[in-house]
C-alpha cells in the first residue's frame, strides 16, 4: 500500500481552481479517498489530459497513485456532494456521492471549468452501508460509453482514467476492484436542488441556483428573472440532449433525477445501452422492470424530471406562489415542443433533408414503423440509407436491412420523390448524412466481450480496440468492418446492470 508519506507527497499534475468547496458546508462532506493495495493504470486519456491543461508526464508517472486515490494531488479539496433524488418515481431525500469523491476543479486551455471526480474511491458519509468501491467491468463500460458519446458529438461526461486497485470487491461474485476518473462541466444534478428543497432550505436553493448561473449560464445574470431564465435554459438543453440520444438509439436506463445534470451533459452510464433492432419499447436495464425508462419514454421522463426541478425553484421564480406555478408550468409545457423541434430536425438530417416540408414527420414515422415491423437494425439502416443517397447501386444493401427485401420499396419511392424537391446534390447529401448516421456505435455485445476479456483474463486488447474504433464513429474504417454488425442471436445482450 502507498505510505501516508507518499500520499501527502506533492504532485503538481493538476492546477486546481476549486469553487464548489467554497459553498456552505451543508452542500458536501469533506472526504479523503481510501487507499488501495496495488493500483495499476489501465488507461490514461492523454488527449483529454492535455486539453485540460494537466501535466501529462506527471500523470504517466504518478497516474496509478493519483487516480486510485492513493496520492492526493496538491491543491485538491476532496469532497462528496450532497443530493437527493427521485429513483424510479420514488423520492429519496438523501442520496449523495456514496462512492465518488470530487478532487477539485481545473480550468482547461479554453478557459472552461471542469470537475475531476474519482468513482469507486471508497466510502463516504453518503455510502448508505455500501463499500464505496467499483468493479472493473462497470469502470470499463463507463470509460467506453463516455468516450463514444463524445465522439458521436453528444454532450456527456468524459473519461480521464481507469485504474485497477489490486483489491477485490464483493457483489454477487468476487470481482477485481477499479476506480474511474470522470470529468464533467459539473456534477450538479436536479437532485442537488431537491436536497435543499426537501429540507425547506430556500437559502440553500438560492445559493445553489446562483452558483449554477455563475458557472453554467452567466449570461442569464442580466435576465429580468434569472431564476426563470435558468429553468428555461435547462429545459432547452435537456430537450436537445434527449433528442440526440434518440438519434443514435441510446437508452440511458436510469433517468432518475439524481442522474440528470443541469449542465445538459449525459451522466452515469451504469445500465445504459444502444439499441440494435429498432423498437421504441426497448429496455436493457435489469432494474427497469416496468419500462419506465424505455427508449421512447425518455423524452417524457425528461419533462417529468424538469417538473421536479421547477418545484424546487418556485420560491425564487416569483414571490407570489400562484404566479410562480404558472410561470414554471409554462416552461414545462413548452418542453414538448422544444423536444419535438430538435428531434425532427435531427431526423430530417438522418434521411438527408435540408429543407423543411409539412410531410416530413409522416415520412420519418413511416420509416420507423417499417423498421420496427421488419426488425431492422437502427444504426445500420440509417448508415445504409446514407450510402444509398450517394449511390443508387447501394439499394440492395439498404433493402437487406429488412426481413423482407421488398418491404422498403414503397418508402424508398416516397423518399426519392421528396428528395427531388430538396436543393442538395446527391454527393453533398450523402456526405452530410454520413456525418449524422454513425457506422459504429458501442454495440452491447462488443462492450460485454471487452469487459469479459478484462475480468476473466486481464486482457485489455478488446477494450483498446473498441476505443480505437469508437473514436471515429462516422468513418467507414474497413479494417474494423465486423464492429459495424449487429449481434448474432447468441451474442445478444438482454440486460445491463448498474455498477459504478
From Swiss-Prot:
Active site per database record: 258
Gene name for this UniProt entry: ydiU
SUPFAM superfamilies per UniProt: Protein kinase-like (PK-like)
Reactions listed under catalytic activity: L-seryl-[protein] + ATP = 3-O-(5'-adenylyl)-L-seryl-[protein] + diphosphate; L-threonyl-[protein] + ATP = 3-O-(5'-adenylyl)-L-threonyl-[protein] + diphosphate; L-tyrosyl-[protein] + ATP = O-(5'-adenylyl)-L-tyrosyl-[protein] + diphosphate; L-histidyl-[protein] + UTP = N(tele)-(5'-uridylyl)-L-histidyl-[protein] + diphosphate
Keyword Nucleotide-binding: yes
Function as written in the Swiss-Prot or TrEMBL entry: Nucleotidyltransferase involved in the post-translational modification of proteins. It can catalyze the addition of adenosine monophosphate (AMP) or uridine monophosphate (UMP) to a protein, resulting in modifications known as AMPylation and UMPylation.
Similarity comment: Belongs to the SELO family.
Annotated signal peptide: none
Name the UniProt record assigns to this protein: Protein nucleotidyltransferase YdiU
Organism per entry: Rhizobium etli (strain CIAT 652)
Binding, Mg(2+): 259, 268
Cross-referenced HAMAP family: YdiU_SelO
List of residues binding ATP: 96, 98-99, 119, 131-132, 182, 189, 268
